[in-house]
Regions:
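Solvent-exposed, polar/charged alpha-helical surfaces in well-ordered, non-transmembrane soluble domains
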Residues: 53-61, 75-86, 104, 118, ...
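Short, surface-exposed glycine/acidic/tryptophan-bearing loops
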Residues: 78-125
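A short alpha-helix/helix-coil micro-patch that ends at or immediately precedes a cysteine
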Residues: 35-89
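C-terminal motif of bacterial Sec signal peptides marking the signal peptidase cleavage site
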Residues: 22-25
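Extracytoplasmic
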Residues: 50, 68, 76, 83, ...
Length: 184
């Protein structure tokens, strides 16, 4: 049986189902709002927050396609990423060192890591745009594919008067979970 014939055979059934779905929408007693996936939601609005679970899923999928393990959202890295994004937005400047150096921010935040990397960005209004920008930039792509990374934090900060409008920070890390010996 050819694909074409199979399509024609099921075409009548498909048309009937489509018509029924279309008519049921007309009979609905309320408006059906279609929501954009969260990775298309604009962060260029006061109070907008990145869907961290969606970001982790996108980055983990990308890592998986490159033979690497997934990353999970880390609350401490989320706080550090938020502080960085907000610092850049407040100063209207894209920089890794707007507050302090990346290493000093990790250390100052009490985050111990075997390895860590940070991507920053500005002007991307959606998670999809930020992800694509980082993926298409060799140094940023290398950070998303950081060997050994298992945790991540991501944030966006809105600055309405900035030409960029939205500032992003993404941190990936392999935490150092060893216990620190108490000094006596």
């Amino acid at each position: 049986m050819s694909l074409h014939r199979s399509f024609r055979k099921g075409g009548t059934r498909l048309a009937a189902v489509a018509a029924a779905a279309l008519l049921s929408g007309c009979l609905s007693d309320g408006d059906v709002a279609t929501k954009d996936p969260s990775f298309y939601r604009s962060m260029a609005a006061s109070g907008a927050q990145v869907d961290a679970a969606t970001a982790a899923s996108m980055i983990s999928g990308y890592r998986k396609n490159n033979g690497l393990p997934p990353v999970t959202v880390d609350p401490e890295l989320m706080k550090l990423a938020q502080a960085q994004a907000q610092g850049m937005a407040s100063n209207d400047k894209l920089s890794h060192d707007i507050i302090r150096s990346f290493h000093d921010r990790l250390k100052g935040g009490g985050y111990r890591a075997y390895t860590a990397a940070e991507n920053v960005g500005a002007g991307y209004h959606t998670l999809a745009e930020a992800f694509s920008g980082w993926r298409d930039s060799p140094p940023h792509r290398a950070n998303m594919l950081l060997d050994g990374a298992t945790r991540m934090g991501i944030a966006a900060a809105y600055s309405p008067k900035s030409k960029y409008k939205v500032f992003w920070a993404l941190i990936l890390a392999k935490p150092d979970d060893r216990k620190v010996a108490n000094a006596m």
